[in-house]
From Swiss-Prot:
Glycans are attached at residues 81, 419, 545, 685. Residues 30-133, 134-242, 243-347, 348-452, 453-562, 570-682 form the Cadherin domain. Keywords: Calcium, Cell adhesion, Cell membrane, Glycoprotein, Membrane, Repeat, Signal, Transmembrane, Transmembrane helix. Residues 714-932 are cytoplasmic. It is found in: Cell membrane. CDD domains: Cadherin_repeat. It comes from the Eukaryota. It comes from Homo sapiens. Residues 30-692 are extracellular. Potential calcium-dependent cell-adhesion protein. May be involved in the establishment and maintenance of specific neuronal connections in the brain. The lineage of its organism: Eukaryota, Metazoa, Chordata, Craniata, Vertebrata. This is Protocadherin gamma-A6. GO terms for cellular component: plasma membrane. Residues 922-932 have a biased composition (Basic residues).
Length: 932
């Protein structure tokens, strides 16, 4: 069997395909670098060895080199570290010109593996070229009649950089007539255009010097400037044109000298000198120039001599119109003379006055003139007349003389100049007449006072205005002239609130501007009534007055003031009582506030700002009533703290806050017991005092029944009472029966009283505040007038031993009685017009509790009489000590009655009692409790 034949050509083809595949795969992984232009020679471009996966020492082993198609070798390999570096300075503009991207491509050849690796290096442009104008100075000539928005190309600017480093914009020095706009061709350079923003006037400014700045967008920005000289050229492109080529007119031969015959008109659309047209005669004889004259500015042709039909009946005149530079136009004027009676009457004013006072009486002579006619016979007889509408008349004088006189009063303010036309007419056929105008000026007299356009003024000024600010301006008009019309302003003297009016406002005598000399306060001054006087400078001066009402407008500059509860002065916090059995909506108290502002600045709203137990209480938005929002629970704390904010509706709103302390308990003993459990006893004396208070309150229930029985017995046997008291001789004070009430009265008594316990924040002791009850009869003995009444139980009082005294009943104290408006009651018991409401009969209950506590304290001692010592208010037990409460301050100073400025006071001269002598220790304790 023959061996298989080999095909060497096929093997070479397979090898070539394998090599090409290897090179193609290597070429797919192209290496890219990016460097800025203008790098120094040998600058690092990229780590080519790392990117090829070789080591630096393998460069020579593998035969790694750069294969480039260009003649210039831009890059080279560093044999030491195998990095690609620049072979020299690279200028992007020289290499790629204006191409957006500059890419340099070459290959890295690994000879031993025959692998080619394409490398692409992007040369990034830097801002190394400044925009350059091809010309640094350029003159632009513009016709003065160039239309706005006209464009004028300027010199080109060249910047070889690309992108943001190339030319980006232009800036023109500030000028209102020109602006610069940038134009650019598609993929071409940018060039500026000068844009005319408005019309030019060569006579106003003939040359403009502008500075044009070209800027690129590099960092930093490079720029260059060029000077632009704009010259405005004058244009005369319109020739004067007559309105018609031939003018024809016919005039009578008796036309007076100087009478206009005809007016020719030529128009020139140019402006300035180019539009100024002058007129002149052309190609006329000397005789014609003596008869007619032409106004060079108006084109009016008039007679300069008498016309005579018999001498010449026709005239032909040549007229030329010419502008400043010399453009001209011509026309013909044909004048025909008509044959008429050529002698007209003539009027010659021989004497007269051109000015007359407006106060001149009727019959004053103004002028004397003469009339005559050159004709004879009837044609020479002349009559004169003036318009009947004028306040003048003609009077015949000697011969052909006439006098012009006034026949009515003159008023310069109505007519200050009269042009009196005197018409002279002959009796020819047809009659001829002539007119002469006599001008008469009417001189002013001071016969008109200054008048204000309004009968009165109302000025509104916000309060707190700055001093010296102008608040209003008045203007009086005087129809007179000169000195008679010069108006000065002043204010009538007056006083306001004990101060002169001039201390509030002043007025500028020349301008009539009213200034405020002080800052107005709406709460102190709400309006001013002023009288402004306007006087002229005539002789005698005339004046008029106008009323000016200045109203001060309110600003929200007063925060709400809280009237109830009053802010404490002794450091303690007033406590409101809310029973635990209170239902939702129970009225606990009411916050009463006022605002001195007015309008919506005084509208108040109340809100609960902070509460120790959220959701337990609510505050009425408009009433300020503090009510329970839900039923009270056992877990609710005894002491509840509420912060109520009162805010007005001003802009910006102002507010005030008040802190309320609410004690949650059904009875005062509960409060004392809870307070005793809240704070441990720090001193033995404090514990004893608390124990005494608890024992005294516990005895109330026992004493109360006996107290009611005694009151009922006294009411039924009141007629025996005085006899029994006189017979007893035991020192009991007599008590009128009318001072006691029965069981039903006590029940009503309980219902009409409320209580208020003022608890200090650091003590278990309480101040029981007794308000005035709402009945007139009060049990008060003589000693109660001489001692303080608040029930503050101290150790001194417990240690005081009663001594026998001669008791005597004092008459009722009228200072303790309220007027109807001052009586406390529920928040709804008073009319809506009252200034405040009393929350929930709190004083009444407090009064009853104090009376019962006083009785219980005396009963506990067992040595007092029923008349009572001072401070018991006539309710002490029969065998109790004389309980005086002499060391306690007068509670009535702490009682505030909303809606009234009344203060609970004792009778005059009986308020301050002297304290009994005691030990030093007892005095210190009393002082400490008074401070609390």
């Amino acid at each position: 069997m023959a061996p298989p034949q080999r095909h060497p050509q096929r093997s070479e083809q397979v090898l070539l395909l394998t090599l090409l595949g290897t090179l193609w795969g290597a070429a797919a992984a192209q290496i890219r670098y990016s460097i800025p232009e203008e790098l120094e020679k040998g600058s690092f471009v990229g780590n080519i060895v790392k990117d090829l996966g070789l080591e630096p020492q393998e460069l020579a082993e593998h035969g790694v080199r750069i294969v480039s198609r260009g003649r210039m070798q831009l890059f080279s390999l560093n044999p030491r570290n195998g990095s690609l570096v620049t072979a020299g300075r690279i200028d992007r503009e020289e290499l790629c010109a204006q191409s957006p991207r500059c890419l340099v491509s070459f290959n890295i050849l690994v000879e031993d593996k025959l692998n080619l690796y394409p490398v692409e290096v992007e040369i990034v442009d830097i801002n190394d070229n400044t925009p350059r104008f091809l010309k640094e100075e350029l003159e632009v000539k513009i016709l003065e009649n160039a239309a706005p928005s006209s464009r004028f190309p300027l010199m080109e600017v060249y910047d070889p950089d690309v992108g943001m480093n190339s030319l980006q914009g232009f800036k023109l020095s500030g000028n209102s007539h020109f602006s610069v706009d940038v134009q650019s061709e598609a993929h071409g350079p940018k060039y500026p255009e000068l844009v005319l923003e408005g019309t030019l006037d060569r006579e106003g400014e003939a040359v403009y010097r502008l500075v044009l700045t070209a800027m690129d967008g590099g960092d930093p920005v490079r720029s260059s400037v060029a000077q632009i000289l704009v010259t405005v050229l004058d244009v005369n492109d319109n020739t004067p044109m007559f309105t018609q080529p031939v003018y024809r007119v016919s005039v009578p031969e008796n036309l007076p000298v100087g009478t206009p015959v005809l007016a020719v008109t030529a128009t020139d659309q140019d402006e300035g000198v180019h539009g100024e047209v002058t007129y002149s005669f052309v190609k006329i004889t000397e005789k014609i120039s003596q008869i007619f004259c032409l106004n060079v500015l108006t084109g009016e042709i008039s007679t300069s001599a008498n016309l005579d039909y018999e001498d010449s009946s026709f005239y032909e005149l040549g007229v030329e119109a010419r502008d400043g530079p010399g453009l001209r136009d011509r026309a013909k004027v044909l004048i025909t003379i008509l044959d008429v009676n050529d002698n007209v009457p003539e009027v010659v004013v021989t004497s007269g006055s051109r000015t007359i006072a407006e106060s001149a009486p009727p019959g004053t002579v103004i002028a004397l003139f003469q009339v005559f006619d050159r004709d004879s016979g009837l044609n020479g007889l002349v009559t004169c007349s003036i318009p009947r509408s004028l306040p003048f008349e003609l009077e015949k004088s000697v011969g052909n003389y006439y006098r012009l006189v006034t026949n009515a009063a003159l008023d310069r303010e109505e007519v200050f100049l009269y042009n009196i036309t005197v018409t002279a007419t002959d009796k020819g056929t047809p009659p001829l007449s002539t007119e002469t105008i006599i001008s008469l000026n009417v001189a002013d007299t001071n016969d008109n006072p200054p008048t204000f356009p309004h009968s009165s003024y109302s000025v509104y000024v916000l309060e707190n205005n700055p001093r010296g600010a102008s608040i209003f301006s008045v203007n009086a008009l005087d129809p007179d002239v000169d000195q008679n019309a010069q108006v000065s302003y002043s204010l009538a003297e007056d006083t306001l609130q004990g101060a002169p009016l001039s201390s509030y406002v002043s007025i500028n005598s020349d301008t009539g501007i009213l200034y405020a000399l002080r800052s107005f306060d709406y709460e102190q001054l709400r309006d001013l009534q002023l009288w402004v006087t306007a006087s002229d400078s005539g002789d005698p001066p005339l004046s008029s007055n106008v009323s000016l009402s200045l109203f001060v407008l309110d600003q929200n500059d007063n925060a709400p003031e809280i009237l109830y509860p009053a802010l404490p002065t002794d450091g303690s916090t007033g406590v409101e009582l809310a029973p635990r059995s209170a239902e939702p909506g129970y009225l606990v108290t009411k916050v009463v506030a006022v605002d001195r502002d007015s309008g919506q600045n005084a509208w108040l709203s109340y809100r609960l700002l902070k509460a120790s137990e959220p959701g337990l209480f609510s505050v009425g938005l408009h009433t300020g009533e503090v009510r329970t929002a839900r039923a009270l629970l056992d877990r609710d704390a005894l002491k509840q703290s509420l912060v109520v904010a009162v805010q007005d509706h001003g802009q910006p709103p102002l507010s005030a806050t008040v802190t309320l302390t609410v004690a949650v308990a059904d009875r005062i003993p509960d409060i004392l017991a809870d307070l005793g459990s809240l704070e441990p006893s720090a001193k033995p004396n404090d514990s004893d005092l608390t124990l005494y208070l608890v024992v005294a309150v516990a005895a109330v229930s026992c004493v109360f029944l006996a107290f009611v029985i005694v009151l009922l017995a006294l009411r039924l046997q009141r007629w025996h009472k005085s006899r029994l008291l006189q017979a007893s001789g035991g020192g009991l004070a007599s008590m009128p029966g009318s001072h006691f009430v029965g069981v039903e009265g006590v029940r009503a008594f309980l219902q009409t009283y409320s209580h208020e316990v003022s608890l200090t924040a650091d003590s278990r002791k309480s101040h029981l505040i007794f308000p005035q009850p709402n009945y007139a009869d009060t049990l008060i003995n003589q000693e109660s007038y001489e001692k303080s009444e608040p029930l503050l139980i101290t150790q001194d009082l417990l240690e005081t031993k009663g001594e026998p005294r001669q008791l005597q009943q004092a008459p009722p104290n009228t200072d303790w009685r309220f007027s109807q408006a001052q009586r406390p009651g529920t928040s709804g018991s008073q009319n809506g017009d009252d200034t405040g409401t009393w929350p929930n009969n709190q004083f009444d209950t407090e009064m009853l509790q104090a009376m019962i506590l006083a009785s219980a304290s005396e009963a506990a001692d067992g040595s007092s009489t029923l008349g009572g010592g001072a401070g018991t208010m006539g309710l002490s037990a029969r065998y109790g000590p004389q309980f005086t409460l002499q060391h306690v301050p007068d509670y009535r100073q702490n009682v505030y009655i909303p809606g009234s400025n009344a203060t609970l006071t004792n009778a005059a001269g009986k308020r301050d009692g002297k304290a009994p002598a005691g030990g030093n220790g007892n005095k210190k304790k009393s002082g400490k409790k008074e401070k609390k």
